[in-house]
Amino acid sequence: MKTEKDKVQAHSASSKSASVSDMTVGSPLRQICKFALPLILGYILQQMYLVIDAAIVGRWIGVGALAAVGASSSIMFLVMGFCNGACAGFAIPVAQAFGAKDYRKMRVYVANAVRISAVIASVVTLLSLMFCHRILQLVNTPADIFHDAYIFLMSQFAAIPFTFGFNLFSGQIRALGNSRQPFYFLITSAVVNILLDVVFILGCGMGVAGAGIATWLSQALSVVLCIWYIRKHMQLLIPHGDERLFDNKRTSILLNNGVPMGLQFSITGIGIIMLQSANNALGTTCVAAFTASMRIKYLFTCVFENIGVAMATYCGQNLGARQMSRITKGVKDAICLMLVYFVFTFIVIYPFADWMMRLFVDSGEAEVVSRAAQFMRIANYFYPALGLLTILRYSIQGLGFSNLSMLSGVMEMIARCGVSLWLVPALTWTGVCLGDPVAWCMADVFLIPAFLWVQHRLKEQAI
């Protein structure tokens, strides 16, 4: 039975449409688009920042510095991917409780998620800083860029608590259907980051260390903004009294959602590190080409990723409300949306890939431009496979089957390891270009039957 306090806060939630959004009513496509658009704009902005950051590093410090930042990218994906995945998993029970209108349970989840996140962030930060040098050695980082890569990576690892904090609190805000505020915070963080890049790199001559410190400070700002917004406008999320106490059952549910999702990203990251290691062995030119192409690739593929993130919240809320037919309709609508976007990317990438790569390096670096453009075009052919992967994976996560989504990450890892061991030695750079497409297709082979099984399982439970 709901307390009087819950009833008041439920009324507050319904009246403050700017703060929360109920995705269990209305057109599924409209709800998904409404939720995904701020996410997409935010991530495009974030990726544009990374493009500008790479351009500043590549043009004002040099190709070697750009390669140093790129040599760290796969390691960052491994570590930060775990943090981001775990926080996304912690938001799933919050979304489900919100969809079921059980606000007390929701706040218990929030309190325990904060407690778990503080422990995980501390441990991950300590281990990352301790083994940073050794990890760079294991991935065959070229000697001429090793020092810069080490400095940059250490500065990124020092920012893990802030990265974890932003993903945790923004995930809880999004669990209530509000994706706009995290978007505004990303805008603020990105602008501050770019300004600090200019100050530290161009003004102070701090090199790649300046880029790392700029990221550290901007991430800290984004955490402060999230906490301020929750306290000011989303009191529904703030635990009170015994809701703050440790709850073994809720903690177990949070870990069952968060750890598999975190491991999924880390397992995928292992495959990316294997691919990065194989690419590093090809020399600084290929490392720089990989860095430039990945920056532009993420600018385009973040749309697929964020349609998926929208599906996790959408499925979580509708599962809580026991509306299975809306879940199926939403997945179909998301797939149609993904295919329309793929057509747009093909029209843009195929003719303009070379031009986009020249943003990063001087016109004299023709080989870097050519290789990076080849990477972009090959990956673009397989974007439908990536779009299907993100929609199905996040939908499965939102429905509470995070272990299955983790197994899809295992499939990606196996595929990338296979490419690294056999295709890259045989095809050199072309083999590197095939790493992502092969991984996406392998994951889809697993995810399609997995999603159909989850649908069948939940329908049986509802009978």
PLM regions: where:
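Transmembrane helical elements of multi-pass membrane transporters/channels
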Residues: K34-D53, S155, F166, S189, ...
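Interfacial/gating helices of multi-pass transporter permease domains
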Residues: V57-F77, A143-D148, V208-A209, R250-N257, ...
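Hydrophobic transmembrane alpha-helices of multi-pass small-molecule transporters
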Residues: L78-G81, T125, N193-D197, V223-I227, ...
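Helix-terminus/linker motif at the lipid-water interface of multi-pass membrane proteins
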Residues: M48-A67, L136-A143, V199-M206, S266-L299, ...
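Short runs within selected transmembrane alpha-helices of multi-pass transporters and secretion channels
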Residues: C87, S155-R174, P182-A190, A211-V224, ...
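Short alpha-helical transmembrane segments in multi-pass integral membrane proteins
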Residues: M1-A36, V94-A159, G203-V259, C315-F382, ...
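N-terminal transmembrane alpha-helices
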Residues: M23-W60, S74-G89, P93, A118-T125, ...
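Small-residue-rich hydrophobic transmembrane alpha-helices
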Residues: L66-L126, T163-P182, A289-A353, L386-S408
